[in-house]
């Protein structure tokens, strides 16, 4: 049996760790949105609990999801009176955007 080069094993380990971190970001993004927004918006595949609240999986049909990045980090305010203001730190914004990008239906 030939010895596996150390560089290959290191690259494989980094790839696995990177994939694991990306999966954790997606789960964290989903959890943050569920906690902050799930009482009105569909965060996953189902219908939104509030009939006028758009499902997050269709946001990309209205505008680029990345456009939300600044608003989420600086404080998201809507003209809708029932929607509270939300502000997330940079790591949470990254996780939220990653999750939103992963669920978009085009």
Could you say what each language-model-derived stretch is?
Residues 1-3:
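N-terminal secretory signal peptides that target proteins for export/translocation
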Residues 6-17:
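Bacterial N-terminal signal peptides
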Residues 16-32, 52:
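Electrostatic cytochrome c docking/interface patches
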Residues 30, 45-73:
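Gly/Gly-Pro-rich "capping" loops immediately C-terminal to redox-active cysteine motifs
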Residues 34-43, 96:
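The canonical Cys-X-X-Cys-His
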Residues 66-86:
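Short Fe-S-cluster ligation motifs
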Residues 85-106:
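C-terminal capping alpha-helices of c-type cytochrome domains
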């Amino acid at each position: 049996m030939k010895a596996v080069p150390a560089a290959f094993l290191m690259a494989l380990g980094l790839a696995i760790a990177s994939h694991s971190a990306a999966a954790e970001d997606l789960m964290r993004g989903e959890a943050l949105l569920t906690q902050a927004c799930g009482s009105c918006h569909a965060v996953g595949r189902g219908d939104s609990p509030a009939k006028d609240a758009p499902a997050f999986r269709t946001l990309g049909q209205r505008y680029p999801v990345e456009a939300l990045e600044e608003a989420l980090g600086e404080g998201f305010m809507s003209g809708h009176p029932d929607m509270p203001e939300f502000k997330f730190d940079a790591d949470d914004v990254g996780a939220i955007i990653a999750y939103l990008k992963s669920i978009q239906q085009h």
